[in-house]
């Protein structure tokens, strides 16, 4: 058996996935190149930076600009094998001297968002550049200026051409970040198919809702169930959490940062997984247990003759349709079990939980 035909396992495939770099790392490298050129007239290319955990990656410059009193450098973001919407975007840093005593000042250029709501790590009115990238860029400026005996009074404008369109594919509009993307990252490294960015956005969404005094938030597994719940409540956009498959990300954060009421809305299959006790509802990380469904169906009055049909059904939807065909309500016991899982995860936190189960057309099958 040769290498081309040798089977691979998931751990091997995962190990072969290529890492990438965050927008914050790219912005820091671009800032280092631009400031170096502003002082010396020469752009370092490639440019290396030290990440928070000590790694030293090097970045090729995709753009250079040197003018009267300013310098610009751009780096194309490489997210590795992660399906990141900012992959391929050009992160540009423009630097110029600030008035004495100003220190390092950050501005949002084209395609970088501005924070408009309280509750985020950055206050309203500021460029959506998160704390770690700000610290990395500030340290770079202080280091370079110290080398040349200059005060670190620098204005840094980060821009991302096309960033306003890219931002429409992110959670920024709901978080009240307008005009573009955020410059993010805590380690500087993008790990392929990591859940951390999504869960981070869920947490920030809860923070924004709490800061706005919102007493009720909605987490949905998809747009169909979200629309069904919104038809009932018409919540403001900042009260809608992009939960997706990460029910645990919502519940565990609310356990520590409670809001009065949480509605979880989802399709039958996703909420069956939550009912089983799964907190990550993605198909690759949790599966529907047909024996669990049969136990509930039997309690609901399903005949013994239906047992094998349920146990060997291809999908949860097939089970739902089978039980509906004889007039059984499977959605309510699923909703009740899902609510049990949610309350157990909250561990007594003062959060009232509502579960809404929908079909694929958005019709509400159960609400408890």
Curated annotation (Swiss-Prot):
Catalysed reaction equations from the record: Co-precorrin-5B + S-adenosyl-L-methionine = Co-precorrin-6A + S-adenosyl-L-homocysteine
* Metabolic or biological pathway, per its Swiss-Prot or TrEMBL entry: Cofactor biosynthesis; adenosylcobalamin biosynthesis; cob(II)yrinate a,c-diamide from sirohydrochlorin (anaerobic route): step 6/10
What organism is this sequence from?
Brucella anthropi (strain ATCC 49188 / DSM 6882 / CCUG 24695 / JCM 21032 / LMG 3331 / NBRC 15819 / NCTC 12168 / Alc 37)
Which family does the record claim for this protein?
Belongs to the CbiD family.
- Tell me the Pfam families matching this sequence: CbiD
Keyword RNA-binding carried by entry: no
Could you tell me what this protein is called? Cobalt-precorrin-5B C(1)-methyltransferase
Which Enzyme Commission number(s) are on file for it? 2.1.1.195
> GO biological process annotations for this chain's record?
anaerobic cobalamin biosynthetic process; methylation
The terms under GO molecular function for this entry are: cobalt-precorrin-5B C1-methyltransferase activity
Identify the PANTHER family for this entry: COBALT-PRECORRIN-5B C(1)-METHYLTRANSFERASE (PTHR35863:SF1)
The residues that cross the membrane are none
Keywords attached to this entry: Cobalamin biosynthesis, Methyltransferase, S-adenosyl-L-methionine, Transferase
**Top EC class per UniProt?**
transferase
Q: What is the name of the gene encoding this protein?
A: cbiD
């Amino acid at each position: 058996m040769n290498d081309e035909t040798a089977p691979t396992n998931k751990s091997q495939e995962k190990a072969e996935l290529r890492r990438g770099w965050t927008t914050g790392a790219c912005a820091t490298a671009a800032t280092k190149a631009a400031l170096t050129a502003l002082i010396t007239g020469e752009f370092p290319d490639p440019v290396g930076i030290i990440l928070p955990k000590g790694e030293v990656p090097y970045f090729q410059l995709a753009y250079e600009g040197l003018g009267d009193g300013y310098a610009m450098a751009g780096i194309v973001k490489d997210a590795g094998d992660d399906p990141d919407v900012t992959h391929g975007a050009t992160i540009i840093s423009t630097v110029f001297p600030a008035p004495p005593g100003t220190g390092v000042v950050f501005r949002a250029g084209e395609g970088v968002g501005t924070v408009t709501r309280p509750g985020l790590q950055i206050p309203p009115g500021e460029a959506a550049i998160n704390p770690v990238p700000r610290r990395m860029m500030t340290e770079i400026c202080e280091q370079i200026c110290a080398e040349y005996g200059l005060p670190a009074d620098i204005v840094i404008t980060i821009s991302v051409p096309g960033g306003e369109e890219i931002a429409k594919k992110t959670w920024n509009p709901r978080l009240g970040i307008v005009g573009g993307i955020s410059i993010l990252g805590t380690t500087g490294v993008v790990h392929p198919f990591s859940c951390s960015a999504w869960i981070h956005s869920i947490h920030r969404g809860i923070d924004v809702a709490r800061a706005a005094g919102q007493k009720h938030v909605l987490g949905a597994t998809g747009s169909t169930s979200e629309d069904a719940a919104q038809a009932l409540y018409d919540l403001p956009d900042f009260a809608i959490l992009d939960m997706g498959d990460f029910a645990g990300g919502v519940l565990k954060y609310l356990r520590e940062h409670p809001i009065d009421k949480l509605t979880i809305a989802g399709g039958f299959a996703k909420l069956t997984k939550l009912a089983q006790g799964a907190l990550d509802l993605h198909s690759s990380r949790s599966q529907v247990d047909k024996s669990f469904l049969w136990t509930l169906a039997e309690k609901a009055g399903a005949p013994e003759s239906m047992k094998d049909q349920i146990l060997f059904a291809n999908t949860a939807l097939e089970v739902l349709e089978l039980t509906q065909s004889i007039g059984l309500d499977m959605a309510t016991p699923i909703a009740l079990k899902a609510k049990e899982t949610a309350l157990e995860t909250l561990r007594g936190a003062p959060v009232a939980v509502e579960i809404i189960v929908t079909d694929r057309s958005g019709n509400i099958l159960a609400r408890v």
